[in-house]
From Swiss-Prot:
GO CC annotation terms, alphabetical: photosystem I; plasma membrane-derived thylakoid membrane
Cofactor: [4Fe-4S] cluster
Membrane topology listed for this record: Peripheral membrane protein
Co-factor binding details: Binds 2 [4Fe-4S] clusters. Cluster 2 is most probably the spectroscopically characterized electron acceptor FA and cluster 1 is most probably FB.
Organism, as annotated: Synechocystis sp. (strain ATCC 27184 / PCC 6803 / Kazusa)
The encoding gene: psaC
Functional note: Apoprotein for the two 4Fe-4S centers FA and FB of photosystem I (PSI); essential for photochemical activity. FB is the terminal electron acceptor of PSI, donating electrons to ferredoxin. The C-terminus interacts with PsaA/B/D and helps assemble the protein into the PSI complex. Required for binding of PsaD and PsaE to PSI. PSI is a plastocyanin/cytochrome c6-ferredoxin oxidoreductase, converting photonic excitation into a charge separation, which transfers an electron from the donor P700 chlorophyll pair to the spectroscopically characterized acceptors A0, A1, FX, FA and FB in turn. Mutant proteins with a 3Fe-4S center are unable to reconstitute PSI activity in vivo.
Binding site residues for [4Fe-4S] cluster 1: 11, 14, 17, 58
Residue pairs linked by disulfide bridges in the UniProt entry: none
Catalytic reaction annotation: reduced [plastocyanin] + hnu + oxidized [2Fe-2S]-[ferredoxin] = oxidized [plastocyanin] + reduced [2Fe-2S]-[ferredoxin]
Protein name per the record: Photosystem I iron-sulfur center
Lineage of origin: Bacteria, Bacillati, Cyanobacteriota, Cyanophyceae, Synechococcales
Length: 81
């Protein structure tokens, strides 16, 4: 099952999440919106197993990256009973 990985604008380009991911789901891409001139991107979300190591590694208090597991995605969309 793939999971939704969202990168938010609080990314500081530190690469901690990329290094923490055991499946190389994340990568850094050029971006002019931060001092590091790069931001995390998730081009391979279908490979995400939902371990949330990227969230744990993120120094911006879990605000840069969110991994939504299948049940969480359903709840957040108001589809759960």
């Amino acid at each position: 099952m793939s999971h939704s990985v969202k990168i938010y604008d609080t990314c500081i380009g530190c690469t901690q999440c990329v290094r923490a991911c055991p499946l190389d789901v994340l990568e850094m891409v050029p971006w002019d919106g931060c001092k590091a001139a790069q931001i995390a991107s998730s081009p391979r979300t279908e490979d995400c197993v939902g371990c949330k190591r990227c969230e744990t590694a993120c120094p911006t208090d879990f605000l840069s990256i969110r991994v939504y597991l299948g049940a969480e995605t359903t709840r957040s969309m108001g589809l759960a009973y």
